[in-house]
A protein has these predicted regions:
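Hinge/beta->alpha junction and helix N-cap segments in small-molecule ligand-binding domains
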Residues: 1, 20-21, 44-46, 59-66, ...
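Hinge/cleft segment of the Venus flytrap/periplasmic-binding protein
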Residues: 73-137
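Hydrophobic alpha-helical segments within soluble ligand-binding/sensing domains
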Residues: 58-79
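Short, hinge-like loop/turn segments at secondary-structure boundaries
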Residues: 6-7, 32-34, 57-61
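Extracellular/periplasmic Venus flytrap/periplasmic-binding protein
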Residues: 1-10
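Stable alpha-helical elements in mature extracytoplasmic
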Residues: 2, 25-29, 63, 67, ...
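Periplasmic-binding protein-like
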Residues: 10-22, 41-43
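Venus flytrap/periplasmic-binding-protein-like
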Residues: 25, 29-53
Length: 137
């Protein structure tokens, strides 16, 4: 596994972008990183749900609002889609797996304080196979 190679190489941290293949494997690799003391950062909250230390991604509420504004401008005001500027965001949402955080010997409140200036919000989550599993508990 790639996770084994990263652990063997002694990396300080791992980042994986949003990728469904990696996310599917997360439940089988997150403990390898924890055992090695390696924080695993990812591009989506679903990875943190599956055991990664932290996921950081777009704030979907902000994205949806901005997208709706752009669509309304095109459909209602006749704006030309070809000249509608591309929008970017300078912050997002972080999701920290508190179980993994503790297993790595990190204090959640300290991690949260460090992340807050970079995010619209910092969420807490625990390891589960799906968001539905969390809602059932």
């Amino acid at each position: 596994l790639a996770a084994d190679a990263l652990v063997a190489d002694g990396v300080d941290a791992v980042f994986t972008p949003t990728d469904n293949t990696i996310m599917t494997a997360e439940l089988s690799i997150y403990e390898k990183f924890i055992d090695a003391g390696i924080p695993h950062y990812t591009g989506a909250d679903s990875f943190a749900l599956n055991g990664a230390f932290a996921g950081y991604g777009v704030d979907y509420a902000n994205l949806g609002a901005k997208t709706a504004d752009m669509v309304a401008d095109i459909l209602l005001n006749g704006a030309d889609p070809a000249t509608t500027p591309v929008e970017t965001f300078d912050n997002g949402t972080a999701t920290v797996n508190t179980e993994t955080c503790e297993a790595l010997g990190l204090d959640f409140e300290t991690v949260k304080a460090a992340m807050e200036p970079l995010c619209t919000q910092v969420n807490e989550i625990v390891t589960a196979e799906s968001f539905n599993e969390l809602e059932a508990n």
